[in-house]
């Protein structure tokens, strides 16, 4: 297989890259280790609302991915899912051979690393027998809010994810218990105020300072969560249908460290103006990219994608881009109608 650009990572920024490259008449193959496109947006919080995407006062993560894929579809990007990039070999001075864990080989003229935070796994609480309950009544992400309709939920954690999902699930749950080691929650003040209002209304109960201690149930279905007070060691038993532990994610850049590119604190160092890495024709965008003043926002990743694609065009064609506004770029026929 042969293409212009291989994009490593099928998160929102990686998918948008296929659109932006297509606008410059460059083809893309997108490779991702997950079994569906969307990165963390679909794997961890598909129904979580996002508020900082231009033109959308609010949009769920899943809907954003669907819209981005539809936007890119006229340019027919090729997705290689459930595959991890294992090797990047120089074919010659102007191309690479990218090899995946499935044995797929793609020849390309440039590579864009849009790997987000790398390969991620949720931090599992050290509870005996928790594996028996995982994906049955213990979950580390929420795929369908409706699954929690009229259920009793224990949410553990004190960061943004725990607080945000408490607010969202309180709209459908029968009762939510929020377990945290400290009295203060590490979330934005607006969300903290919402938690206080929900607690005063009786919709949720903030149980602090406590930590998870034991699980009880049968055949993977929870019946109760036992918690322990941090200071007094007192134990409490909370009847529950579901446990949602939100203790963050452990990140691993995987094989990126062996690709002969400069790294800094598990991030890929790039030139801010072009998003070039230390290796010719390899670029990095989105959360994985590092430069002075970097903002880890989806919006910023979209801008980086655009800058990288424009620079790749100049490198591949040895000439500047004949700039066109998208309003004057007509895409018809086989590539569908964007207008």
Swiss-Prot record:
Record key words, sorted: FAD, Flavoprotein, NADP, Oxidoreductase
Entry binding sites for FAD: 32, 40, 45, 85, 120, 287, 327
A GO term, aspect molecular function: ferredoxin-NADP+ reductase activity
Record's keyword annotation contains Nucleotide-binding: no
EC number: 1.18.1.2
Enzyme class, first EC level, given as a word: oxidoreductase
Catalysed conversion reaction: 2 reduced [2Fe-2S]-[ferredoxin] + NADP(+) + H(+) = 2 oxidized [2Fe-2S]-[ferredoxin] + NADPH
Cofactor: how bound: Binds 1 FAD per subunit.
Gene3D superfamilies given in the database record: FAD/NAD(P)-binding domain (3.50.50.60)
Coiled-coil region(s): none
Entry cofactors: FAD
Pfam annotation, one family: Pyr_redox_2
Keyword Cell wall biogenesis/degradation listed: no
Family: Belongs to the ferredoxin--NADP reductase type 2 family.
Record PANTHER family: THIOREDOXIN REDUCTASE 1-RELATED-RELATED (PTHR48105)
Subunit structure: Homodimer.
Name the record gives this protein: Ferredoxin--NADP reductase
Species name: Wolbachia sp. subsp. Brugia malayi (strain TRS)
């Amino acid at each position: 297989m042969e293409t212009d650009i291989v994009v490593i990572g099928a998160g929102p920024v990686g998918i948008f890259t296929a659109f932006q490259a297509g606008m410059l008449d460059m083809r893309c193959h997108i490779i991702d280790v997950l079994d569906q496109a969307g990165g963390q947006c679909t794997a961890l919080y598909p129904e979580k609302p996002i508020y900082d995407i231009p033109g959308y006062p609010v949009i769920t993560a899943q809907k954003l991915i669907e819209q981005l894929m539809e936007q890119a579809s006229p340019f027919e990007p090729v997705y290689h899912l459930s595959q991890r990039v294992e090797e990047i070999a120089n074919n010659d001075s102007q191309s690479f051979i990218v090899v995946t864990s499935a044995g797929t080989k793609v020849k390309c003229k440039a590579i864009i690393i849009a790997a987000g935070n790398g390969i991620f796994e949720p931090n599992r609480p050290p509870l005996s027998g928790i594996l028996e309950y995982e994906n049955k009544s213990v979950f580390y992400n929420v795929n369908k809010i409706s699954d929690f309709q009229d259920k009793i939920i224990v949410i553990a954690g004190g960061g943004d994810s725990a607080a945000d999902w408490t607010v969202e699930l309180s709209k459908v749950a029968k009762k939510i218990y929020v377990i945290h080691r400290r009295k203060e929650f590490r979330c934005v003040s607006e969300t903290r105020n919402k938690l206080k209002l929900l607690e005063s209304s009786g919709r949720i109960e903030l149980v602090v300072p406590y930590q998870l201690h034991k699980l009880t149930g049968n055949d993977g279905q929870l019946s109760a969560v036992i918690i322990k007070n941090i200071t007094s060691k007192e134990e409490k038993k909370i009847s529950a249908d579901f446990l949602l532990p939100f203790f963050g994610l452990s990140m691993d850049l995987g094989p990126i460290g062996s690709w002969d590119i400069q790294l800094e604190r598990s991030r890929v160092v790039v030139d801010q103006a072009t998003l070039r890495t230390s290796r010719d024709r390899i670029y990095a965008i989105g959360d994985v990219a590092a430069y002075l003043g970097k903002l880890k926002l989806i919006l910023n990743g979209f801008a980086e994608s655009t800058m990288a694609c424009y620079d790749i065009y100049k490198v591949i064609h040895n000439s500047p881009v004949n700039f066109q506004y998208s309003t004057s770029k007509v895409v018809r026929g086989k590539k569908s109608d964007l207008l």
